[in-house]
């Protein structure tokens, strides 16, 4: 059974890398005669349960195919720049055509910090710089990519992504006294979060209403033990390679 058939039967989401590098686009076109997104569209694979990671080397036609299928994409700008893929996801065109845009970190080997605050800022700045236009990807749009749009990509927009009556209390509480967030007002709060804040400004975190981080201290794990376990694992891997 193919992945699309399985998804249709179970409602499972489908995530995959799409047009991350120019080389993979050329290789796919040589094999199939079509660019990756065009080919996926032609075989009826794309739908609202698809989340296409990267999507850096897309034509406007492919963007429209994703929009028509109600698919989502997850741009990973820090990883893309670290790997020097050369492409920049056409985010303004995606927004215009109605693609559900999200932002992601990719894996730790190609991103390292996995910092979603840094990812929002980098995405916005990369789009502005590559377009020579400081007005593209506004701060609110960048925040939406990481919250409400991400919830929609997971099919969970009625449960998470925003603070509303009836939704789960998945909440990140920032330290409003942090110098990086000051001065602050209703007018600049979102901009401060996207362009000035970092993960060090997170004070507490709630998941399903349960406080899992309180005053920067994880409540359900021993962070020291986790760090030591990671160190020992790295040393064991290094020893095996020697």
Which functions belong to the PLM regions below?
Residues 1-72, 84-101, 118-121, 158:
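Histidine/acidic residue-rich metal-binding segments in metalloenzymes
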Residues 15, 160, 240-242:
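Flexible, glycine/charged-enriched surface loops at secondary-structure junctions
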Residues 17-19, 53-55, 74-76, 102-104, ...:
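Generic beta-strand/beta-sheet core signal
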Residues 20, 77-81, 107-109:
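Short, acidic/turn-prone active-site loops that include or flank metal/cofactor-
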Residues 29, 33, 83-87, 110-113, ...:
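Alpha-helix N-cap/helix-start motif
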Residues 38, 42-49, 92-178, 183, ...:
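His/Asp/Glu-enriched, well-ordered alpha-helical/loop segment
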Residues 168-227:
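C-terminal cap of metal-dependent C-N hydrolases
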Residues 227-242:
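Short, solvent-exposed cationic patches
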């Amino acid at each position: 059974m193919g992945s699309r058939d399985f998804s249709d039967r179970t409602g499972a989401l489908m995530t995959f890398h799409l047009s991350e590098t120019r080389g993979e686009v050329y290789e796919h076109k040589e094999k199939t005669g079509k660019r990756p997104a065009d080919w996926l569209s032609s075989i009826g694979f794309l739908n609202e349960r698809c989340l296409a990671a990267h999507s850096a080397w897309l034509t406007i036609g492919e963007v429209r195919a994703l929009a028509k299928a109600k698919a989502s994409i997850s741009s990973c700008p820090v990883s893309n720049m670290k790997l020097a893929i050369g492409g920049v996801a056409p985010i303004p065109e995606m927004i215009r055509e109605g693609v559900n845009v999200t932002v992601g970190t990719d894996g730790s080997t190609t991103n390292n910090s996995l910092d979603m605050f840094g990812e929002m800022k980098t995405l916005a700045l990369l789009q502005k710089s590559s377009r020579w236009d400081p007005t593209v990807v506004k701060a609110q749009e960048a925040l939406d990519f990481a919250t409400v749009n991400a919830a929609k990509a997971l099919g969970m927009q009625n449960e998470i992504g925003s603070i509303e009556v009836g939704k789960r209390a998945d909440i990140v509480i920032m330290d409003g006294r942090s110098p990086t967030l000051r001065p602050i007002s209703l007018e600049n709060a979102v901009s401060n979060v996207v362009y000035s804040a970092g993960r060090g400004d997170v004070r507490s975190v709630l998941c399903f209403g349960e406080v899992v981080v309180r005053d920067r201290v994880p409540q359900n794990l021993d962070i020291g033990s986790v760090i030591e376990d990671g160190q020992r694992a790295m040393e064991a891997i290094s020893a095996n390679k020697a």
